């Protein structure tokens, strides 16, 4: 039995949390025991949404956040690792950026032999662009294994010897949960008051403007409406709706933008869409792009983002600097390109390494090395 301490997750479910959860739900729990380290107050818990998605026991340990009282927090972190490190064979540190190396440092200091850093993002936001490249120089001093969700993330996280050793671990999914279902599409559109013959564009993601660039979606949608008035923009996820509502009002499309809120069933909700639109400012290799393609959806994303192409109806030809009208035309041009051959979809996802059972076997093999 290998015992693994999982770090870097937050209490709610974002892309990173969902990736780790999917692996945990499929891992052989007779061979691997995972425990989770959360930052926050003593009563911090994973959200009900997280717990609902998790099918295995959740053992959670808590340490304080680094900020604003970093000195005191680091003392508590040191105490936790000093008292508990002997219980673990592996540290699995999941990170969107190399904002700090403390988990890896403490794991090494107190004798956790296998120390994995797993990169989930291919660019850093402005706040971390200074510290990430510095920590990139030293990550090899503390980690033993170097993983990334894709080639772009691998190059962003590692250089030199670490890059040569690094492995790509695909963000894998349970394909059957995402296969297109026309009956569910009809049902969902009725539920949200969308006419059956309406053109629906949208995305699944946390509403987080700095990264996800959702105001750009609204602006492009305002151009789509000029060309196809019978259209809707659907945001599936929770976050700052007020900001986007104001943008929608400014561009005159407030009555055509729908916020569904949080969902525990992404596969079902994807059926409501005709095109998946994802013009983020930065990403690693978003699992939602794999999920959207499993649903057969045409995907339109920006050309600076990592390439998650599996199906031929995946388009990343445009830049965020291109005009709103060009984006609108591109989205409308693929509106009828949903891939309905489910056998083909399943085969391509498996061949590209995104099928969860195969990916979990790879993960288990690496944990055992």
Whereabouts are the PLM-identified features?
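A short, active-site helix/loop in glycosyltransferases that binds the activated sugar's phosphate group
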Residues: 142-180
């Amino acid at each position: 039995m290998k015992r693994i301490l999982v770090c870097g997750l937050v209490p709610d479910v974002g892309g990173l949390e969902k990736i780790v959860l999917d692996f945990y739900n499929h891992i052989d729990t007779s061979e691997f025991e995972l425990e989770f380290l959360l930052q926050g107050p003593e009563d911090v818990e994973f959200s009900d949404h997280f717990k609902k998605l998790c099918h295995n026991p959740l053992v959670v340990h808590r340490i304080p956040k680094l900020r604003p009282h970093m000195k005191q927090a680091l003392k508590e972190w040191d105490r936790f690792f000093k008292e508990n490190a002997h219980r673990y064979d592996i540290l699995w540190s999941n990170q969107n950026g190399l904002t700090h190396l403390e988990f890896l440092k403490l794991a090494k200091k107190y004798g956790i032999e296998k120390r994995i850093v797993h990169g989930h993002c291919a660019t850093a936001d402005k706040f971390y662009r200074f510290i990430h490249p510095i920590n990139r120089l030293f990550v090899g001093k503390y980690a033993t294994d170097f993983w990334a969700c894709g080639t772009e993330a691998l190059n962003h996280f590692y250089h030199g010897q670490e890059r040569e050793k690094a492995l790509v671990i695909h963000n894998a999914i349970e394909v059957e949960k995402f296969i297109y279902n026309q009956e569910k599409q009809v049902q969902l559109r009725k539920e949200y008051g969308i006419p059956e013959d309406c053109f629906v564009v949208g995305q699944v993601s946390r509403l987080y403007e700095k990264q996800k660039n959702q105001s750009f979606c609204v602006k492009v949608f305002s151009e789509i409406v000029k060309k196809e008035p019978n259209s809707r923009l659907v945001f599936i996820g929770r976050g700052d709706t007020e900001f986007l509502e104001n943008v929608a009002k400014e561009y005159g499309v407030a009555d055509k933008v729908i916020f569904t809120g949080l969902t525990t069933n992404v596969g079902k909700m994807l059926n409501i869409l005709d095109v998946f639109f994802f013009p983020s400012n930065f990403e690693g290799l978003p699992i939602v792009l794999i999920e959207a393609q499993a649903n057969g959806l045409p995907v339109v994303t920006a050309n600076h983002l990592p390439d998650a192409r599996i199906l031929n109806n995946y388009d990343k030809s445009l830049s965020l600097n291109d005009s709103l009208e060009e984006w609108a035309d591109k989205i409308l041009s693929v509106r009828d390109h949903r891939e309905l051959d489910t056998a083909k979809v399943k085969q391509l996802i498996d061949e590209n390494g995104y099928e969860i059972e195969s990916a979990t076997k790879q993960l288990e093999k690496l944990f055992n090395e």
